[in-house]
Amino acid sequence: QTAKMLRQLMHMAQYVQSHALHFFHLASPDLLFGMDAEPAKRNVIGLIFEKPEIAVKGVMLRKFGQEIIEMLGGKKVHPSFAIPGGVNRALSPEQREKILQQVDGVIANFQFALDLIKDYYAQHGKEAANFASFSSGYLGLVDDNGNLELYDGKLRLRDEKGTILEDKVDPKDYLSIIEERVEDWSYLKFPYYKKWGYPRGIYRVGPLGRLNVVDGITTPLANKELREFKKLSINGIVEGSLFYHYARLIEALYAAEK
């Protein structure tokens, strides 16, 4: 159980640093400066000069996640930690206290980011609702109660209306519901829901896909945000691709709380 919790700790740290990197460094320049802004300004360097307080929050969030990875794995990139049956390193009491002392600030910074993205949607509601919005299936991991799971769960697939098509499928049995198509113009494979065929059976994954399949989140602040997120549509299925940012920050908040 201890080894599992340590693995989860590293995994949540990875979500914290990765989601912070995406939102603050990659996405926020587009959102804050406008997608038509000069490319020379519309980047993380422009963010540092124009809105340094926001840039610093992003840097510190990523630093927090990376430092946890380093504590457990010995290094920030390609850590050596998980081994068959457990882990190869413990967390010292001093390291645990260092993490705990920073958690409240990390949570507050993600709440700041959530306020930022919600302000953007309030000002660009029509654009957010219509940009790259299309019907598809959604696939993600859930726990036994249908809550968000980022570490170890079962597969759930919903359609665009919110109907559960497949539930509690063991990931090792994914080929029982998923097939892959090969196109001659791409090295990528195109997975789809086997019963519906291609292209009807295409589905989305990632933060938007995951929040569209879950019933709840097990941490209070992220679950409150999920309830608001679900109100963006009548049936709780959010289709606009610009809402990936919102979903990603809710996941980051969950990871920080977890």
PLM ranges: what are they?
Residues Q1-K258:
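Active-site bordering "gate/hinge" segments
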